[in-house]
């Protein structure tokens, strides 16, 4: 009888764990429908961004594509974010978070997570640009990789293919290495960067998981 009770208890536990994991996975929300740039907004040089074969293709003059959709009213504070990315030789791009739409120029608000495996800028993919930069190249051009960002409170974790490359906590008194203005943990939306006409990058499976404040 005791063995039966243990078996039943174990089965219930496994079912509970399975349900928990399933719910956890289902918390991911897609920000890109794979067909259009609906819910995204770009100002100057809009032709830098287009959709092909379920991907956002970035190639053209300097521009930024901001998420302006209904998920969290495009205002994220604590979250997990991930996207599948492919770079081509010499390409430079970035993923901004805690940003806000602006018509042109480099985003004045938010942090940038670097996408760059072989551009002349030494700050490589996964760098928290100008704040916690990395020189190592963890992934190759012409291959898909997953870039992951998690923000909770003042803490930022960045992973490349599940490898932690940045684990940064913003101090109460921020002393940045470079003049990057509005780079502060706050809240806001995401943006994809079109860096220059020579850079070509693909993005797909752009997902977010909002986390409690």
PLM region descriptions:
Residues 1-5:
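Positively charged n-region of N-terminal signal peptides that target proteins for export
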Residues 7-16:
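Bacterial N-terminal signal peptides
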């Amino acid at each position: 009888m005791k063995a039966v009770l243990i078996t039943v208890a174990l089965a219930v536990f496994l079912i509970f764990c399975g349900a928990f994991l399933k719910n956890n996975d289902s918390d991911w929300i897609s920000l890109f429908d794979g067909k259009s740039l609906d819910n995204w907004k770009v100002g100057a040089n809009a032709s830098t961004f287009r959709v092909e074969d379920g991907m956002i293709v970035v190639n053209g003059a300097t521009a930024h594509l901001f998420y302006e959709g209904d998920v969290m009213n495009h205002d994220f504070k604590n979250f997990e974010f991930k996207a599948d990315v492919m770079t081509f030789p010499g390409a430079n791009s970035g993923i901004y978070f805690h940003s806000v739409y602006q018509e042109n120029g480099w985003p004045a608000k938010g942090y940038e997570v670097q996408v760059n495996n072989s551009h002349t800028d030494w700050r490589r993919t996964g760098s928290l640009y100008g704040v916690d930069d990395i020189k190592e190249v963890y992934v190759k051009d012409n291959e898909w990789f997953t870039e992951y960002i998690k923000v909770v409170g003042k803490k930022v974790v960045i992973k490349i293919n599940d490898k932690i490359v940045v684990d940064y906590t913003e101090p109460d008194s921020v002393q940045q290495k470079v003049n990057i203005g509005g780079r502060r943990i706050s809240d806001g939306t995401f943006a994809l960067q079109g860096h220059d006409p020579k850079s070509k990058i693909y993005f797909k499976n752009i997902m977010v998981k909002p986390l409690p404040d």
